[in-house]
Swiss-Prot record:
Gene3D superfamilies: Cytochrome c/b562
Species this protein is from: Magnetospirillum molischianum
One MF term in the entry's GO annotations: heme binding
One BP annotation, GO: electron transport chain
Keyword Transport: yes
Protein name, per record: Cytochrome c'
InterPro entries hit by this protein: Cyt_c/b562, Cyt_c_II, Cyt_c_prime, Cyt_c_prime_subgr
Residues annotated for heme c binding in this entry: 13, 17, 69-70, 118, 121-122
Function: Cytochrome c' is the most widely occurring bacterial c-type cytochrome. Cytochromes c' are high-spin proteins and the heme has no sixth ligand. Their exact function is not known.
PTM section of the record: Binds 1 heme c group covalently per subunit.
Length: 128
């Protein structure tokens, strides 16, 4: 049975909340605003897993739903680029997990790279 568009919208909203909950403590540390999360490596691994699963939440048919925050191009003319953004996030999050295991300086450096991937996708595909 195919998922209803409304269910996919809820799924993607949940996936984005999960990413945020895992990322914010790491980003706070990287910015010097919070202590190093003891579970930083696990958080980064969780982010990579979510990034690999996330595209299922952006299936065609969900682009016009109310409360969707994604620009229509992500579903159409730029869908390949949008999917590449998720792949990039999965890659950078995997690197982030390795960096967390290597130490605080490595984590800070990789957090900057991971954050750039997030920012680029939001700038390109998130509605204002």
């Amino acid at each position: 049975q195919q998922s209803k568009p409304e269910d996919l919208l809820k799924l993607r909203q949940g996936l984005m909340q999960t990413l945020k909950s895992q990322w914010v403590p790491i980003a706070g540390f990287a910015a010097g605003k919070a202590d190093l999360p003891a579970d930083a490596a696990q958080r980064a691994e969780n982010m990579a897993m979510v990034a690999k699963l996330a595209p299922i939440g952006w299936a065609k048919g969900t682009e016009a739903l109310p409360n969707g925050e994604t620009k229509p191009e992500a579903f159409g003319s730029k869908s390949a680029e949008f999917l590449e953004g998720w792949k990039a996030l999965a890659t950078e999050s995997t690197k982030l997990a390795a960096a967390a295991k290597a130490g605080p300086d490595a984590l800070k450096a990789q957090a900057a790279a991971t954050g750039k991937v997030c920012k680029a996708c939001h700038e390109e595909f998130k509605q204002d």
